[in-house]
A protein has these predicted regions:
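Terminal helices and disordered tails flanking the catalytic cores of nucleotide-processing hydrolases
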Residues: 2-149
Length: 149
């Protein structure tokens, strides 16, 4: 799948361009060993064999540093937030909680030393950021008549 291949393609590009190992490590850990949920669910809903799911998992490496965890979570939240229909505080909060809790429950964070306190801080900061990013703006009316100088 093209979506899964972007990790290995990114690594090839990084090597071709002589990027340092630390950046290559970020490339291979930003999805860890997660499942491509959207495509997996569509496959299952279309009658696919639940035992034939290897193609829906990234073959990367789980993050080992806090910084890699931050990238993994921010990448997932950013992508998922684009599909929101409702940008209310509750909707954003639910999305962020679901993604971070899901990564933890899936064991994606188990090789890092990130603490629960740090994860909770991340949750709050990401929620605040998304609320600010998606907040409604007042539509300013245009002036009728002559334009002012």
């Amino acid at each position: 799948q093209e979506i899964i291949r972007h990790v290995s393609d990114g690594l090839v590009m990084a090597e071709k361009n002589g990027l340092p190992q630390v950046l290559k490590d970020f490339i291979v850990t930003h999805h860890g060993t997660t499942c491509t949920g959207y495509f997996y669910n569509r496959y299952i809903n279309d009658g696919g064999d639940p035992d034939d799911v290897a193609d829906f998992y990234y073959d990367g490496v789980k993050p080992t540093s806090k910084e890699q965890v931050i990238l993994m979570i921010c990448d997932a939240v950013e992508a998922a937030s684009r599909s929101l229909k409702d940008y209310s505080e509750a909707s954003i909060s639910s999305l962020v909680d679901r993604i971070i809790d899901g990564k933890a429950e899936d064991g994606q964070l188990s090789d890092s030393d990130i603490s629960l306190r740090e994860l909770n801080t991340m949750k709050e900061e990401i929620k605040l950021y998304l609320q600010q990013m998606y907040h409604s703006r007042v539509v300013y009316p245009k002036r009728k008549g002559r334009a002012s100088k």
